[in-house]
Amino acid sequence: MPNLTIALDAMGGDFGPHVTIPAAINILKKYKYLSIYLVGNEAEINSLLQNTSTSIKSRFTIIPSLDDIPMDLAPALALRNFKQSSMRMALNLVREGKAQACVSAGNTGALMVLSRHLLKVLPFVDRPALVSTLPSMTTQPVYMLDLGVNVSCDADALLQFALMGSALAEHVGNIPIPRVALLNVGQEDIKGNDLVKHAAQLLSKNPNLNYIGFIEGNDIFSGKADVIVCDGFTGNVALKTSEGVVDLVISQLTSVSNNNIFTKLLSLLVKPLIMSSLKRLKPDQYNGATLLGLPGIVIKSHGNAKQVAFEFAIEQAVKEVESGLVNKISASLDIID
């Protein structure tokens, strides 16, 4: 297995190096051929590596940074200022060819703007898209994009999203002929706005896509489609709503045992089974959204990700680099006029 190097924005997210460093240590134990750049506050990073074995430490390279981009900072300000931020410096390592991927739990808008500014975009790509895996009723996950970085876009952009998402599902998700659908308010051809109707025409004519038509919100997790395409506003609302529903169900199941003696007894029997099933819906194991359309791998972790969730994000970067995803996406886009 060839050596692989990833750059981590060690300071990003709600918990910064207290999550990113332990996660990175565990990942190095699992992937013996992996090396990691840790970009951030050198003193903080070193303090968290004190009890790490020499063999693991030798595969870390610390790159000191001077700034951290606040989570609520406007993307334009992140671009103009914060030249020595951990996020920007981690992305620069990818641009310079020193790392094959960057992983950050920092400000999503800043990551998008800086990635596009520093790395540019692939030929035939107008704008990168944010894609993530979601659980389904089958054994296969669902890939959904865009999830928020393109709140408005045209039909040509949705075609690009579809091609990139299909390449991801095929080469990283190991789905031979991914089924691609457009998220809409109905399945009939007459349903939807002009955007999705025009996009449907483009997707149906593209020979690189296995386009199956429209899909409704209630079927996102059904497994009927492998790749679901929409604008970023729609995708983000759908994603956050589904996460909220999972939290609500788990909260209700946790509190139901306090009602009376019957529900207490029933919960002792049933709740462990239900909670076990619901664990596969928790976002931790699906952490790690990808910015597709760049000449390098950039992974966005949830800002509130804990250690295990951040490990999933790093693993997603490893899988995408190993699959040669960037080249596969470039090949899939070559057919666009």
Curated annotation (Swiss-Prot):
| Cross-referenced NCBIfam families | plsX
Q: Which cysteines in this chain are paired by disulphide bridges?
A: none
Q: What is its EC number?
A: 2.3.1.274
The record's subunit annotation is: Homodimer. Probably interacts with PlsY.
Protein's name according to its UniProt entry: Phosphate acyltransferase
Q: Which GO terms describe its biological process?
A: fatty acid biosynthetic process; phospholipid biosynthetic process
What is the phylogenetic placement of the source species in the record?
Bacteria, Pseudomonadati, Pseudomonadota, Gammaproteobacteria, Alteromonadales
- Catalytic activity, reaction form: a fatty acyl-[ACP] + phosphate = an acyl phosphate + holo-[ACP]
Q: Where in the cell is it found?
A: Cytoplasm
Q: Does the keyword Ion transport apply?
A: no
Q: One Pfam family of this protein, by short name?
A: FA_synthesis
Family (UniProt)? Belongs to the PlsX family.
Which UniProt keywords are present, listed alphabetically? Answer: Cytoplasm, Lipid biosynthesis, Lipid metabolism, Phospholipid biosynthesis, Phospholipid metabolism, Transferase
A molecular function (GO) held by this record is:
phosphate:acyl-[acyl carrier protein] acyltransferase activity
Asked if the Swiss-Prot or TrEMBL record annotates the protein with the keyword Cell inner membrane, the reply is: no
